[in-house]
């Protein structure tokens, strides 16, 4: 599972991904794309 820092989400800073509508900078996303229905773990 990619770390949030490994995700480059369109429209988001390159060091962040979006999990469940929240930009997270730590932990992991369950879905690599960081979709809105994803969760930070």
Curated annotation (Swiss-Prot):
Potent inhibitor of fibrinogen interaction with platelet receptors expressed on glycoprotein IIb-IIIa complex. May prevent blood from clotting during either feeding and/or storage of ingested blood. Belongs to the ornatin family. InterPro entries: Ornatin (IPR002463). It comes from Placobdella ornata. The keyword S-adenosyl-L-methionine does not apply. This is Ornatin-A3. It is found in: Secreted. GO terms for cellular component: extracellular region. A motif (Cell attachment site) lies at residues 33-35. GO terms for biological process: cell adhesion; regulation of blood coagulation. Keywords: Cell adhesion, Secreted.
